[in-house]
Curated annotation (Swiss-Prot):
Nucleotidase that shows phosphatase activity on nucleoside 5'-monophosphates. This is 5'-nucleotidase SurE. It is an enzyme of class 3 (hydrolase). Coiled coil: none annotated. It is found in: Cytoplasm. It comes from Parasynechococcus marenigrum (strain WH8102). A divalent metal cation binds at residues 8-9, 40, 98. Its cofactor is a divalent metal cation. The lineage of its organism: Bacteria, Bacillati, Cyanobacteriota, Cyanophyceae, Synechococcales. Keywords: Cytoplasm, Hydrolase, Metal-binding, Nucleotide-binding. Gene3D superfamilies: Survival protein SurE-like phosphatase/nucleotidase (3.40.1210.10). The gene is surE.
Length: 266
């Protein structure tokens, strides 16, 4: 199987190298196209004002991996891979393993999820994989689980337009609880910015919010599914189905009436 892998932590990150090695160990044909440096929290941004460069980086990975380090964002990397660098269309896109969680509504700013979403938009089964702790640096168990889940999802006829978002708790495989389907949590933060003053007396800001640990809040989905945050809190891997269609799924009668002299027709 042809597997294309990217991330947002960059080509030197241990997570992506472990994931690529796990896919090779399962007998897959692996290509990596990922940022040449840290590109975390870049969301689905694209590079439009400067050229994008790509250099071979095979030596950073296990034998059998074809690798490119790209100057762009994770979404750039995936587009460049699919339309320029990779000869044959991949059977599977994997993005990760991210060095930190991608839970709940944080997926909207995640470069890891954006790379997987690019694959989804191009009709390729795609999965984002994240280690749900910034300090945890043992990726082997998560990499093996991710490849196993992806292989089984493909065998089960992976639906079109489905992106799988896998978060893995910070523990060894034998200490993990069971994998479960989960809903996206609603993520909120306290004290979003840290304000400081430079030597010339001008204010500047660091984005430095602390996440509110809410195990209950979650969006749409079956009520008997836990939130992804609650699942990770239980030391169990979470698997959340995501789709690119953001159309409002609430009641249409609840939409604003917008009485603008018949300018809005419904």
């Amino acid at each position: 199987m042809r597997v294309l892998i990217s991330n947002d932590d960059g080509v030197f990150a241990e997570g992506i190298r472990t994931l690529a090695a796990a896919a090779v160990a399962r007998g897959h044909d692996v290509t990596v196209v990922c940022p040449d440096q840290e590109r975390s929290a870049t969301g689905h941004g694209l590079t439009l004002q400067t050229p994008i460069r790509a250099e071979r980086a095979d030596e950073l990975f296990v034998p059998g991996v074809t690798a490119w380090a790209c100057s762009g964002t994770p979404a750039d990397c995936m587009k460049l891979a699919l339309f320029e660098l990779v000869k044959d269309k991949p059977d599977l896109v994997l993005s990760g393993i991210n060095h930190g969680p991608n839970l709940g509504t944080d997926v909207f700013c995640s470069g890891t999820v954006a790379a997987a979403m690019e694959g989804t938009l191009e009709g390729i089964p795609s999965m984002a994989i994240s280690s749900a702790c910034f300090q945890w640096r043992q990726f082997q168990a998560g990499a093996e689980l991710a490849v196993e889940v992806a292989e089984q999802a493909l065998a089960d006829q992976w639906p079109e337009n489905l992106l799988l978002n896998l978060n893995i708790p910070p523990c060894n495989r034998d200490a993990m609880g069971p994998l479960r389907w989960t809903r996206l949590s609603i993520r909120r933060y306290d004290e979003q910015f840290s304000s400081r003053v430079d030597p010339r007396g001008r204010a500047y800001y660091w984005l430095a919010g602390e996440v509110v640990n809410d195990l209950e809040s979650a969006g749409e989905g079956p009520r008997d599914w836990p939130s992804d945050v609650a699942q990770i809190h239980a030391n169990s891997p979470s698997l959340t189905p995501i789709q690119p269609d953001l159309f409002w799924r609430g009641s249409l009668s609840g939409l604003p009436q917008l009485k603008l002299k018949d300018q809005l027709v419904r």
